[in-house]
Design a protein with these regions (language model features):
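AMP-dependent adenylate-forming
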Residues: 37, 79-82, 97-237
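Motif- and composition-driven signal specific to adenylation
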Residues: 1-128, 132, 137-146, 172, ...
Length: 237
């Protein structure tokens, strides 16, 4: 197969981007979720459907299921795979083949670890989380783990740790992402630790509020913040 690097300037014009993908007869697409979402929001697939595509891998951020549905409807025979992983694990560590159409309000799993990668959850007491549905910080290890940050010992020591279990030990990376294991055994992304706030005595995930608002018809994307001056939550869409 031939590797096709799509010119960056085409991403600003959906029609030209789709023309190029169709002209080059792209069969496997490896994209950021935001790029797929942009084409869906701008109704690019109503202009042209790249029917040669057999597989689409997406990562980088949470893919809204209502935008993924647009792609699934346009390409019903195409395989979609949700990838997850920080740059520090070079570059993805889990995968989830999307085998059905998800409805609004459902969460898309980030799946299971690739071979050679280890993914586990740690609670606030640095204990491994094993209970289903209980959140913890996603930590990753494996053969592709980075050595650290170039010429930045402080950040390296902060995020790259050693797990000691008896006589065995291994290096791992604390992603700062929250996750949990579902009853189906899959891993689910649950936002960033630094996006978790305490408001009126309640621990709140801003990304969960954003996800709920994005289910409202007509809302494409939402951003939620805490206004500390007025002690109020504010949402922008």
């Amino acid at each position: 197969a031939e590797l096709v690097i799509i010119p960056r300037h085409l991403f600003s014009t959906p029609s030209l981007l789709l023309d190029y993908i169709c002209y080059r007869k792209v069969t496997v697409l490896i994209w950021a979720a935001s790029a797929l979402g942009l084409l869906a929001v701008l109704k690019g697939l109503e202009y042209k459907v790249p029917t040669e595509i057999k597989k689409i891998f997406f990562s980088g951020e949470v893919m809204p299921v209502k935008l993924l549905r647009i792609w699934q409807c346009a390409l019903p025979g195409t395989e979609f795979v949700n990838l997850y992983g920080p740059t520090e694990i070079t570059c993805n560590c889990t995968y989830y083949p999307v085998e059905r159409v998800y409805e609004d309000g459902e969460k898309l799993p980030i799946g299971m670890p690739f071979e050679g990668r280890k993914v586990f959850l740690l609670d606030e007491n640095m204990q491994i989380v094993t209970e289903p549905e209980k959140k913890g910080e996603i930590c990753v290890a494996g053969e592709s783990l980075a050595l650290g940050y170039y010429r930045n010992r402080e950040e390296t020591d902060k995020h790259f740790k050693i797990w000691q279990a008896g006589e065995k030990s291994f290096r791992y990376y604390r992603t700062g992402d929250l996750g949990y294991r579902g009853a189906d055994g899959n891993l689910y992304f649950a936002g960033r630790k630094d996006f978790q706030i305490k408001h009126m005595g309640h621990r709140i995930e801003l990304e969960e509020i954003e996800a709920r608002i994005e289910q409202v018809e007509g809302v494409r994307k939402c951003c939620c913040i805490l206004d500390r001056r007025k002690n109020r939550l504010k949402a922008f869409y």
